Design a protein with these regions (language model features):
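Membrane-proximal helix-turn-helix segments that form the acceptor-binding/catalytic region
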Residues: 71-88
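Short donor-sugar binding/catalytic loops of nucleotide-sugar-dependent glycosyltransferases
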Residues: 9, 142-147, 174, 190
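Conserved donor-binding/catalytic core segment of Leloir-type glycosyltransferases
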Residues: 128-149, 155-161, 168-169
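Carbohydrate-associated surface elements
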Residues: 94, 115
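Short alpha-helical donor nucleotide-sugar binding micro-motif in glycosyltransferases
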Residues: 82, 197-199
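Active-site proximal beta-strand in glycosyltransferases
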Residues: 42-68
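N-terminal pre-catalytic "stem/leader" segment of glycosyltransferase-like enzymes
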Residues: 1-42
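Nucleotide-activated donor-binding/catalytic signature segment of Leloir-type glycosyltransferases, i.e.
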Residues: 172-196
């Protein structure tokens, strides 16, 4: 089958792009052609369609629901693609339930969680760092931080429930909550192998 991956950056490791790259790799291993033809059999549009070349399946990992934003305006292009799509692939049951509450149910939909290549992960060495190695347990969280990702809640939970010799490592851009604490470390953006090494 010829499949066009729409609105995806195979060079990015953000959530939808990372999922798309892994999915494309698996589909190619199974004999499908990805983004190589001008006349695809099907188009997989990530979040919203940039164009329409074939029947559309939408890959959706969430919709906007932050009441402090104009969520209806932000959801407009996502909703347009949802209405256009012949089917929808949701990232999670939560996402499916939330989307169907606001957009209505789709006749053809499925939940496919973000998978990963366990063989690839097994080849990544564990993080070995003299500062981190002195702790009994390493807690971690990573995101492209935005208010609804609740970084402050992550830190609060860690401080309330961690042991005295545990640390928290926070990875990702734009942390919207920062605290100076001898067991909390901000490491910025990490690439995929670095994140796996940390975990």
């Amino acid at each position: 089958m010829k499949i066009y991956f729409d609105n995806i950056d195979f060079n990015s490791c953000s959530g939808p792009n990372s999922f798309g790259t892994k999915l494309a790799s698996e589909l190619e291993k199974n004999g499908h052609r990805i983004n190589k033809d001008k006349d695809p059999d099907i188009q997989l549009s990530f979040i919203q369609a940039a164009q329409k070349l074939a029947p559309v399946v939408q890959r959706l990992d969430g919709i906007y629901f932050n009441s402090e934003q104009d969520w209806e305006l932000l959801n407009k292009p996502i909703r347009q693609t949802y209405d256009l799509a012949n089917g929808v692939v949701f990232q999670s049951e939560f996402n499916k339930t939330l989307t169907e509450k606001y957009f209505g149910k789709k006749e053809k939909s499925i939940v496919i969680h973000n998978g990963t290549d366990l063989e690839y992960i097994s080849k990544i060495p564990e993080l070995n760092d003299p500062v981190i190695n002195k702790f009994d347990n390493v807690w971690s969280c990573a995101s492209s931080w935005r208010p609804h990702k609740r970084l402050s809640e992550n830190v609060r939970y860690f401080l309330e429930h961690s042991g005295d010799n545990d640390c928290l490592i926070i990875a990702g851009n734009n942390p919207d909550y920062q605290i100076k604490h001898n067991r909390v470390f901000y490491v910025g953006n990490l690439n995929y192998p670095q994140l796996i090494s940390l975990y």
